[in-house]
A protein has these predicted regions:
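Intrinsically disordered, low-complexity non-transmembrane regions of multi-pass membrane transporters
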Residues: 1-25, 54-69, 237-266, 509-512
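Membrane-core helix-loop-helix motifs of multi-pass transport proteins
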Residues: 20, 149, 153-244, 260, ...
Length: 512
């Protein structure tokens, strides 16, 4: 998938080619997750022989390794396997969203929209716009992670770039930019919910608030956008080379780049319907007692139907313009056409569903056995006697490594906050800055962590454009983003620390 010239190129390219070669020797992702489950079970059996334990930093309860290869372990497997699969966090969301996105895709709405964007937008703004949307998309949860990569892939083809470059750039922007945004959003509320009680472990006088990282996360957008753009234009696009459309999956359809009068008419009204839908959503959310707000607090972010129902919102937001375009362009002439599109959209997720079955078991094994918690606590304790820049680097590295074991941001910070926050308060750091350090460390390995539930989805997307695509090749195009984010963002945190600038309103670096 790399050009011959690039294969013989720089040290960086040779390194990435080696990563790709090694990664491609890995089994199919579903088999890989199964083997990881087996390996994890064996590991818990071995560790349990040594009676390894830790004290939970929040409850102070002693936590032991639970052996999966035991009576209780086998009982858990029998009782919970199907539940683990059906309750997998991303499964229902992805399948529901794909109903709406599938109609918009199958009718040709997305394709014609991309052609229209390419024809009208200045070429130099297309890539920065995709990156910015990806970074800011975390405000609406995981929406950008699902929607943006396939849109970017189609757009990259239209402007003459390799679609995999678009997929990986959009994905890296969406998941790697979780700790960057110009507004306070769901991620801020999520981490704050753990930081506040962790602060109270050692102090009742330190004030915290949900927006206490705002200055830093807003400034991070300015730092991340050019970083991701540079990696894409200087490394990923040249490395992937010219796209060979013969590699495209047989059932992937490409339409003409020409827009007919009928299609232009349908596209105009589809776009209008999209805008009207968004406006109606905003108007509905404005009233103080809107059903989209938290009934008790009135918040639109904290446990609000607006955020909890984001999957349904995405479905509707894309289904409506897809239907309008399909009806006006005559792509949908009966309910049978619509039903067929629904089925094809969900059917295209078959590979993802199989991978999810095994990935769900791996996550459940880590949680049930307590291995994830013990690894996090043991690692955090290594940092207790450090300070300053060394401590910042240590927490970023540990958070990044824990992210490779535990995918859920709330699960990780729920474990680490009761350790990091009190520990750094004692050293002299305000909880707001501790939270920033964690969020950066958590974000930088998001593009490459196998625990991210959307990585299998990205692989499914990629295989539509390259039938030979394997996980190793995909990771080799994602790794440069993680490396670049690690270097640039860590340096940015350290510079911010040395300057002593507050990370947000009510969020100083040091405890006064």
């Amino acid at each position: 998938m790399t050009s011959k010239h690039q294969q013989k190129g720089s040290i960086v390219n040779r390194f990435l080619n080696s990563v790709e070669k090694i990664g491609n020797k890995l089994p199919d992702p579903s088999v890989l997750f199964f083997l990881m489950c087996v390996g994890l079970a064996i590991m818990t059996w071995v560790i349990s022989l040594f009676n390894v334990s830790v004290k939970h930093p929040g409850t102070h309860q002693t936590i032991y390794i639970k052996n999966i290869i035991s009576h209780d372990g086998f009982t858990m497997i029998m009782n919970d396997t199907i539940k683990n699969f059906s309750e997998f966090p991303a499964l229902g969301l992805v399948l529901a969203v794909m109903i709406g996105i599938g109609v918009a895709e199958k009718t040709g709405y997305f394709d014609k929209l991309m052609i229209s964007v390419v024809n009208r937008a200045p070429r130099f703004l297309i890539l920065p716009t995709i990156i910015l949307i990806g970074i800011l998309g975390s405000t609406a949860g995981d929406a950008a992670t699902i929607i943006l990569p396939p849109l970017a892939a189609m757009l990259f083809i239209k402007i003459g770039y390799h679609p995999i470059a678009g997929l990986t750039m959009a994905y890296a922007s969406a998941v790697g930019g979780f700790a960057a945004n110009i507004v306070v959003g769901m991620q801020d509320a999520l981490v704050y919910s753990f930081t506040e009680p962790a602060t109270r472990i050692v102090s009742d006088s330190i004030k915290t608030n949900v927006a206490m990282n705002w200055y830093f996360i807003a400034a991070s957008v300015v730092v991340l956008l050019p970083t991701i753009l540079l990696v894409t234009t200087k490394l990923i696009i040249p490395r992937l080379g010219k796209y060979d459309d013969s590699l495209m999956h047989d059932d992937h359809e490409e339409t003409s780049s020409h827009i007919t009068d009928k299609e232009a008419h349908a596209l105009k009204w589809a776009n209008i319907s999209f805008i009207v839908t968004i406006i109606l959503l905003i108007i509905t959310a404005i009233p103080e007692h809107s059903f989209l707000r938290n009934a008790k607090t009135g918040s639109l972010l904290d446990d609000a139907p607006l955020i909890n129902g984001v999957g349904l919102i995405i479905l509707v937001v894309f289904l409506i313009p897809g239907l309008v375009y399909g009806i006006l362009s005559k792509e949908i002439q009966s309910t049978k056409d619509l039903g067929k599109m629904f089925g094809e959209a969900v059917g295209s997720m078959g590979t993802f569903i199989v991978i999810v079955f095994f990935a769900a078991q791996l996550l459940a094994f880590l949680k049930w056995s307590n291995l994830g918690i013990i690894a996090a606590v043991k690692g955090a304790k290594l940092l207790e006697h450090q300070n300053g820049i060394v401590l910042i680097l240590g927490i970023i590295i540990l958070s990044a490594l824990v992210n490779l074991l535990i995918g859920s941001a709330s699960a990780k910070w729920g474990i680490l906050a009761p350790i990091f926050v009190p520990m750094l308060i004692i050293v002299g750091f305000h909880p707001a800055f501790t939270q920033v350090i964690y969020r950066v460390g958590d974000s930088i390995t998001n593009p490459i962590t196998p625990m991210m539930p959307y990585l299998p989805l990205l692989l499914t997307y990629a295989q539509k454009y390259d039938k030979r695509m394997k996980l190793g090749a995909l990771l080799s195009s994602l790794m440069p983003y993680s490396i670049a984010l690690s270097i640039v963002w860590t340096a940015f945190v350290i510079i911010w620390f040395l300057l002593g600038i507050p990370v947000g309103p009510g969020g100083p670096i040091f405890v006064k």
